[in-house]
Regions:
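Active-site gating loops and adjacent loop-to-helix segments of metal-dependent hydrolytic enzymes
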Residues: 91-112, 120, 151-152, 156-159, ...
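Divalent metal-dependent hydrolysis catalytic cores, especially in the metallo-beta-lactamase
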Residues: 112-138, 152-163, 187-197, 224, ...
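Histidine/acidic-residue-rich catalytic or RNA/ligand-binding cores of hydrolases
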Residues: 95-98, 142-143, 234-241, 272-287, ...
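Histidine-rich, glycine-flanked metal-binding segment
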Residues: 24-32, 41, 45-81
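C-terminal cap of metal-dependent C-N hydrolases
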Residues: 356-358, 362, 375-419
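Histidine/acidic residue-rich metal-binding segments in metalloenzymes
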Residues: 174-183, 188-194, 199-266, 283, ...
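His/Asp/Glu-enriched, well-ordered alpha-helical/loop segment
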Residues: 218-220, 290, 301-387
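Metal-associated gating/positioning segment near the N- to mid-region
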Residues: 78-147, 209, 237-240
Length: 421
């Protein structure tokens, strides 16, 4: 069985099992209009719309019209908002049959099953678009979802990352060739490791000049760059013209200010990835650099993650995106990052939510397609049980998921109808 056929087989099982518990069965976006009635809509750009109806045609938002006839989905009593975007996940990272972190020794068919299951969990959590950075196999899943064969979020992928080794990484031409090769294979973004893992010291792996070559070549080919960076590599990546900088642990406010001056996007993770690692330690320990020492470093330095996030929120003009770095054990829990951003960083609930909508869409160069409830955009729409502006834990209670005009989840249908007069 090929990788693609495994994905297609899984999709049939996933849809059958999950849809049986829901009120709607996923399929192609209907050509005729759908109408969502809502009394509270967060538009993804900072606005709140009251008592309206969202008209959807051919998978896109056609208009907002409070008088539109023929309500298809009555979401009054819930909070309606654009589907969330997570710009840093590892969709293929999963635990194998033995409960341990799956490695490249896992059979391809099982790897495909794990990735597709993660995609489904992520979609059910309200994330309708993700950027997965780290595996060549992401392309197969991306294409299968786009073709409608597998249910999951829209995926953008870097394929395999570019990992630095200092001067031994290669000449200028070799560095440019690394970018070109990924572009030719269909990468949507170029992932660059400018620092080693936090678990092994977080030292630099590329010079600023090397980063400028890589990010410059990507830009020349119309591709964005996402850079894994700690310490001074944060400001080096900003000066090098890279698009998005992730993590930032051990950096300081001056480094973050450099990112703001450069106009790059920045994301410090505080609410999910380290916590998930620590919770799932037994599933990771002894594989690669997941050592006792590495886990101790992550636990010890979590307050430094909070500190750089607070510095980021306090930096004028800094464009903070929403990303989780979700790996095995964290998929489907992406929304926990919202709570971390508000509690540990001082971000307002609205700012945190916008970061996963219009800010993230802009960071992907897709503001004309995603990230807001507005005419002409993709009908990626979710609903929460509760008002996240008053009770942020509502982000954990996703009751409705639509992507591209197709409903994948409407768990509250029966209860909602029974409660309506």
């Amino acid at each position: 069985m090929t990788l693609r056929s495994v994905l297609l087989a899984l999709s049939l099982g996933a849809v059958t099992v999950e849809a049986a518990a829901a009120q709607e069965v996923p399929g192609a976006a209907p050509a005729g209009p759908l109408v969502i009635q809502a009394d509270r809509v967060l538009d993804g750009r900072g606005g709140v719309i009251r008592d309206t109806r969202i008209v959807i045609e051919h998978g896109k938002i056609a208009r907002l019209d409070p008088h539109a006839a023929g309500v298809t989905y009555d979401l009054r009593g819930y909070t309606v908002l654009p589907g969330w975007i997570d710009v840093h996940v590892h969709i293929g990272s999963h635990f194998g049959r033995d409960g341990r972190l799956a490695t490249d020794k896992e059979p391809p068919a099982e790897a495909a099953l794990g990735a597709a299951a993660n995609a489904w969990r992520t979609l059910m959590a309200g994330f309708t678009t993700v950027q997965s950075v780290g595996e060549a196999a992401d392309k197969t899943l991306r294409d299968a979802i786009d073709a409608g064969g597998v249910p999951g979020p829209r995926i953008l992928t870097s394929l395999d990352p570019i990992i630095g080794r200092g001067d031994s990484t290669g000449s200028e031409e070799q560095l440019r060739a690394m970018v070109r090769e990924r572009a030719e294979r269909g990468a949507d973004v170029i992932k660059i490791f400018a620092s080693k893992s936090q678990r092994v010291g977080a030292g630099p792996t590329f010079t600023e000049a090397q980063l400028a070559i890589l990010c410059g070549e990507a830009k020349a080919r119309g591709l964005r760059t996402l850079v894994h960076a700690y310490r001074s590599s944060v400001s080096a990546a900003a000066r090098a013209g890279c698009s998005q900088i992730e993590h930032g642990t051990y950096a300081d406010s001056a480094d973050v200010a450099e990112v703001a001056r450069a106009g790059a996007y920045f994301s410090p993770q505080v609410g999910l990835v380290v916590q998930s690692y620590l919770e799932n330690k037994a599933h990771y320990l002894g594989i690669g650099n997941y050592t006792e020492e590495g886990f101790a470093i992550m636990a010890r330095d979590l307050p430094l993650d909070y500190a750089i996030c607070r510095a980021a929120v306090a930096t004028p003009g800094l464009k903070i995106v929403f990303s989780t770095d979700a790996t095995a054990g964290a998929h489907g829990r992406n929304a926990e990052e919202f709570l971390g951003r508000v509690k540990e960083c001082g971000q307002s609930p609205m700012a945190a939510l916008i970061s996963a909508n219009s800010v993230n869409a802009a960071s992907l160069g897709m503001a004309d397609r995603l990230g807001a409830i507005a005419p002409g955009l993709e009908a990626d729409i979710i609903a929460l049980d509760g008002n996240p502006l008053e009770d942020l834990t509502a982000v954990r209670r996703v009751v409705f998921v639509m992507k591209g005009g197709v409903v994948y989840k409407w768990a509250g249908a029966s209860a909602a109808r029974a409660a309506k007069p």
